[in-house]
Amino acid sequence: MTFRRIHTDQSAWFCVFRSDQTGEHVLYAALREKDFPEVAMRLTADETTLFRDRPTDFLALARDFIASHDSPVYSSRKITFRSHGVDLIEVV
């Protein structure tokens, strides 16, 4: 499934992608570590609403994901993906 970039926050180094097919959203982040590894997770319906209606609270969620992406809270929600340029990712 392919997701198109709909939002970028350069200060926090994350993007939100959306599937035109399903409406599902993905949070993507480039980590500020050696070689800038990339991680992504699917957003729940509540998190998607937070992104749309309460951007300040969503920013806190994104920052927490970036800082704690290996924690049990997020590790089971992470997805494997391939980047297709800067505007598209494909979940594999």
Positions of the model-derived regions?
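Extended, alpha-helix-rich binding/interface surfaces that flank or overlap catalytic cores
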Residues: M1-V92
